[in-house]
């Protein structure tokens, strides 16, 4: 079974995260930031993963550190759980609508970290539970850099912060589910490694 547990501790945050790509789904999520918990549960449900997260951060300062470090821990766990990449689908894309919002996520479990996401171009109004689309960028940057994947996220329509962030997590979850499936033999690269 492809699974990993990571722990990350800094002067600003503490994160313990368990990710399972196969087998049972679900798991308890408690970060101390209810909206982040809600988003991680979207990732868990729509990605069909086992995802358990316990985290604490300096929320009295800002949500930035906690959101970013949970993304880093998720990336670390994803990289470890994927192992050598044998049999992976590797590439995936997913759309996620939520009322007026439509988001597209395209990713490649390439071993090459790159995030293509420009929140300054998104016409989003406000934030949801202290989290906005700039915090989403920090979460994704942590995931991409430590999970070593290429990720493109596009907002096709929408302005309401809650819907934009939630649709982004749902699209990410669906794309990750597809890309992490084992559908073949060997490493899906002409180089022989990811």
UniProtKB/Swiss-Prot annotation:
The listed locations are: Cytoplasm
The main location is cytoplasm
Q: EC class of this enzyme?
A: lyase
Pathway listed: Amino-acid biosynthesis; L-histidine biosynthesis; L-histidine from 5-phospho-alpha-D-ribose 1-diphosphate: step 6/9
SUPFAM superfamilies, per the entry: Ribosomal protein S5 domain 2-like
Q: Which UniProt keywords apply?
A: Amino-acid biosynthesis, Cytoplasm, Histidine biosynthesis, Lyase
Q: Name one GO cellular component term.
A: cytoplasm
Per UniProt, what is one GO molecular function of this protein?
Answer: imidazoleglycerol-phosphate dehydratase activity
- Which Pfam family, any one, appears in the UniProt record? IGPD
Q: State the superkingdom.
A: Bacteria
EC no. given is 4.2.1.19
Gene Ontology process terms (BP):
L-histidine biosynthetic process
Q: Which reactions appear under catalytic activity for this entry?
A: D-erythro-1-(imidazol-4-yl)glycerol 3-phosphate = 3-(imidazol-4-yl)-2-oxopropyl phosphate + H2O
Q: Which family does it belong to?
A: Belongs to the imidazoleglycerol-phosphate dehydratase family.
Q: What is this protein called?
A: Imidazoleglycerol-phosphate dehydratase
Q: Which organism is it from?
A: Thermus thermophilus (strain ATCC BAA-163 / DSM 7039 / HB27)
């Amino acid at each position: 079974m492809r699974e990993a547990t990571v722990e990350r501790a800094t002067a600003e945050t503490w994160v313990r995260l368990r990710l399972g790509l196969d087998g049972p789904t679900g798991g308890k999520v408690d970060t101390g930031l209810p909206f982040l918990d809600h988003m991680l549960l979207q990732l868990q449900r729509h990605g069909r993963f086992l995802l358990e997260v316990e985290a604490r951060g300096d929320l009295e300062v800002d949500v930035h550190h906690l959101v970013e470090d949970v993304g880093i821990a998720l990336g670390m766990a994803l990289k470890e759980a994927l192992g050598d990449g044998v049999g992976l689908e590797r590439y995936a894309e997913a759309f996620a609508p939520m009322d007026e919002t439509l988001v597209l996520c395209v990713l490649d479990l390439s071993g090459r970290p790159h995030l293509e996401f420009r929140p300054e171009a998104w016409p989003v109004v406000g934030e949801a539970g202290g989290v906005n689309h700039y915090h989403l960028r920090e979460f994704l940057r942590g995931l991409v850099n430590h999970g070593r994947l290429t990720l493109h996220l596009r907002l096709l329509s929408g302005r309401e912060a809650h819907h934009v962030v939630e649709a982004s997590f749902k699209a990410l979850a669906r794309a990750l589910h597809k890309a992490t499936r084992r559908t073949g033999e060997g490493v899906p690269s002409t180089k022989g490694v990811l």
